[in-house]
Amino acid sequence: MARQPLVSSVLVIGSGPIVIGQAAEFDYSGSQALRALREEGIRTIIVNSNPATIMTDEDMADAVYIEPLTVEVLERIIARERPEGLLATLGGQTGLNLAVALAEAGVLDRYGVRLLGTPLEAIRRAEDRQLFKELLLEIGEPVLESLTAYSVEDALRFAEEVPPPLIVRPAFTLGGTGGGIAFSEDELVTLVQRGIAASPIGQVLVERSLLGWKEIEYEVMRDANDTCITICNIENLDPMGVHTGDSIVVAPSQTLSDRDYQMLRSAALKIIRALGIVGGCNIQFALDPRSDQYYVIEVNPRVSRSSALASKATGYPIARIAAKLAIGRTLDEIPNPVTGKTMASFEPALDYCVVKIPRWPFDKFRHGDRRLGSQMKATGEVMAIDRCFEAALQKAVRGLETDQTDLTWEDSRWQDPSALEQALRIPTDQRLWAVAAALRRGWTPEHVSALSGIDTWFVRAIQRLVEMEQRLASEPLTAELLWEAKRLGFADRTIAALRTTTEQEIRAQRLALGLAPVYKLVDTCAAEFAAETPYFYATYEDENEAPPLDSPKAVVIGAGPIRIGQGIEFDYCSVKAAQALHRAGVAAIMLNNNPETVSTDFDASDRLYVTPLDAESVLDVLRHEASSQYDQLPPVIVQFGGQTAINLAADLAAAGVPILGTDQDAIDLAEDRRRFERFLHELGIPQPPGAGVTTLEEALETAERIGYPVLVRPSYVLGGRAMEVVYRREHLEQYLATSGAFASGRPVLIDKYLDGIELEVDALCDGHEVLVPGIMQHIERAGVHSGDSFAVYPAVELPSVHVDTLVRYTTEIALALAARGLINIQFVLHQGVVYVLEVNPRASRTVPFLSKVTGVPMVDVATQILLGRSLGDQGYRGGLWPRQPLVAVKAPVFSMAKLQGVDVQLGPEMKSTGEAMGIDRTFEAALAKAFLAAGLAIERGAPVLLSLADNDKSAGVELARGLLALGHPLVATEGTARYLRAHGVPVELTVAHIGHGHPDVLEVILERKVRGVINTPGRDEGTIQDGFLIRRAAVERGIPCLTSLDTARALVRALLGGGTSFSVQPLPAYRTREAVLA
């Protein structure tokens, strides 16, 4: 008989907003843990500041708090809920750091809360670089020469004994924040300063660099009985020196000898035992490729990004098992839900190869530093599974959804052999393509391996792909050659390009030959036992393990890798859609390739296919599922997967696939500028003057006709990619010359830029009625991307006459488009007139936020509409949903510290990676919470630097007075200080422009003499460059930096209005009329 759990109620700490280094993997692990705890009859309480997560849905826990993740807020929740246990190892670095802080503040002892799973001492010993080093020496594990430093002087003394290159690793940080590789003493000084600032305990480890060694990871689990197992070992294709989150990785390892494998496995088990970790843990090793010498690099004493990958790669539900171990279960008494027959103590086995490739944001940040090092830069990742490494690699490349859809892409600079050699030596996001380019030129695998540090085994595998490219380009396309190419993962599109024909012709030839993929099971046991999970991947073999589902079914297209502009919000929508289909008796088939997310969990849908989200792969799955008595091709839902899914709609419709919801013609109408202009004109709804243009001449003529400034953007993009506000003709010419805006062949949209209040509506349409759950008002004026704006629900200061106009326009547009399901419309209120900016006939990134604050389960309702149920059938009616007795603010969260060379200035191109929410009874309290949750709160009474553009100075006077009233001494650049003093505002310190005196503006930031920066960008060359350096310095020192006066004024308003005295309550309590204070 199973023993009673250690506790009857548990508080789970979430990881907060999505940032580089801490992404959707913690929504996945937290959601799994909450389900596992509920299975055990335990009362669950979740706290997270991120409204876009599945884990903060009200049905996920007994009490759901969307509140700032601070010690003070957590203590209030603990005092109210009185949990017996705290589970912090599923909330990433945020969860771990908060657990340590709660313990050190005496909160856990004061309320009798037990820290579950990994003990506090084990967390400290793994995270504190000095304690970890001492532990490794105690157990006889090899340790690199290193020094735990608390100052630059410490580090420089170490550099005298061990010269650069040196690695700098800050303690208690995520994604290598603040760290890096120092190749000189000057670089060492910069990195140590940055690392000490990033570490919550002001500590960095400085160690000898092992550049070029192999990086190997083991995912290990241990229970309270000291039973330990390895789940998976992972090999980084990139050698040491590149953060594992930025490395291409392969599971299981491909180049280790059995002796090396067993040696590192034994070391991993010894380390997890010595630390006393209970649950999951990730251990990273460096292995000398020329000997069996290894070093332990670090341990993550928690579920991590690698755990999510290992989980999806093996099918073993690590987070679920870790949660059960934390409450006292042991591995030998927990059934493996994947097989239903083995226990969790049974080590997984793989009979396939898994490849993960990171998704970097350099398509958004063309001027960002593409070099990869020990500080992570990727926003997301894709996973591909196949029977061989070559096929899995090619699938993963296709899944990235970049312009480089295969390995044939080359940078034109690589025509120069020295540039190609440089591209191999220096790790960047493009190095994989450089390897293929070098092999095409006849460079030997050994030479390429020596230059790049990538093992020869992997280089030879890429050489086999290059050889197949050459055969496909030159030989007759026989059935045997096509079969071989498909076995190696070549897409129809790539084969067509190599043979200068069309993808459709290759597909027709392939299908005529009867060449189609079969689908294999991911079962944790290499088919040793029958599996119960419906989790499949495609491969070109003979035996199929996935008979088509023989029941009513629908396919949900997921959102692919997390990237700026398309984040976790769309995974939320996909999962909620699958759940709604399941409840309606329709089998939900999920297609996605993101290993971090809930949607690729083995039980998030009735059937999961891990596949690239391109037309070929999706159509192959649909054809496979079509051979059922219920339908020809199963219907597909594209409105929940962001732009990824919408961009597939045209190809799917052309192939005869039934699309549930808004049809393809309406999707095209919303994206086609000329059609959309006519459409709104016929409805009598205003929009900013503009046009879709296809040439430079048309662009210049349109801009002159409507008048500068203009907003310029490509069509069919998400997140405002390559969008810009342009003020002058020469600026427009430069933009069109450098952005590649005309490259897609689709029109570039040019609109008059209207400087007004931006408003946003998400609505539900069943073809007869339109429900508007809520209207959101952006704090920043139009011109700042909606994803980077603070959004407020309800639009608290919008006159009712404009509310009525918004609801009327939304209703007319949705009905005229014949929309079905969700639709998102963005408006601008300019000089008393409401204009339509854009219409998106799909789910938007605000759907999770609005669903949670209004109580309308928008994705569930939309899915039921797609299945034929009207709003009335579901108990809703058209019009504006009753306003809730609360105010909620969605705040953008940025990861700029990780991206050198990228400006934090807000504009029409989206830059934020995640979001946080503040919710309360008043606007000021909700706003103050949003700033706190987003990490933008300025330390009370600390000096604030003001450096304002000329056209912002007059508006900055009131802001400066507000800051003074709050007790913030003012520091200002010369022009701003002069203006403020002339208007009676005292400035404590005037600083010179960069390089024009002492102290200058950079010095006060770099020396942390200010704790907040408000810098609005000017438009002449000098101030543009100075502003960039000011903003970068603030970000790299971890100092809150605001670039919009609207945002800064909102912060001051919140604090002056008493926003710091906010309430803390479960989410549903805010929607009741009675205020419950805690």
Curated annotation (Swiss-Prot):
Give the residue ranges for region: Carboxyphosphate synthetic domain: 1-401
The record's section on PROSITE patterns has: ATP_GRASP, CPSASE_1, CPSASE_2, MGS
- Binding-site list for Mg(2+) 4: E838, N840
Q: Which InterPro entries match?
A: ATP-grasp, CarbamoylP_synth_lsu, CarbamoylP_synth_lsu_oligo, CarbamoylP_synth_lsu_oligo_sf, CbamoylP_synth_lsu-like_ATP-bd, CbamoylP_synth_lsu_CPSase_dom, MGS-like_dom, MGS-like_dom_sf
Spans annotated as Allosteric domain: 936-1078
Q: How is the cofactor bound?
A: Binds 4 Mg(2+) or Mn(2+) ions per subunit.
Any idea which positions bind ATP 1? R129, R169, G175, G176, R208, L210, E215, G241, V242, H243, Q284, E298
> Keywords, A to Z?
Amino-acid biosynthesis, Arginine biosynthesis, ATP-binding, Ligase, Magnesium, Manganese, Metal-binding, Nucleotide-binding, Pyrimidine biosynthesis, Repeat
Detail which positions bind Mn(2+) 1: Q284, E298
Binding positions for Mg(2+) 1 per the UniProt entry? Q284, E298
Q: Which cofactor does it need?
A: Mg(2+); Mn(2+)
TM region(s), chain numbering: none
- The UniProt record lists the MGS-like domain at 936-1078
Check the record and name the SUPFAM superfamilies matching this protein: Carbamoyl phosphate synthetase, large subunit connection domain, Glutathione synthetase ATP-binding domain-like, Methylglyoxal synthase-like, PreATP-grasp domain
SMART domains xrefs:
CPSase_L_D3, GARS_A, MGS
What's the superkingdom here? Bacteria
GO MF annotation, one: carbamoyl-phosphate synthase (ammonia) activity
Q: Which residues of this UniProt protein bind Mg(2+) 3?
A: Q826, E838
Q: Which residue spans adopt a coiled-coil conformation according to this UniProt entry?
A: none
> Domain ATP-grasp: where?
133-327, 677-867
- Domain description: The large subunit is composed of 2 ATP-grasp domains that are involved in binding the 2 ATP molecules needed for carbamoyl phosphate synthesis. The N-terminal ATP-grasp domain (referred to as the carboxyphosphate synthetic component) catalyzes the ATP-dependent phosphorylation of hydrogencarbonate to carboxyphosphate and the subsequent nucleophilic attack by ammonia to form a carbamate intermediate.
Q: What is this protein called?
A: Carbamoyl phosphate synthase large chain
What is this protein's gene name? carB
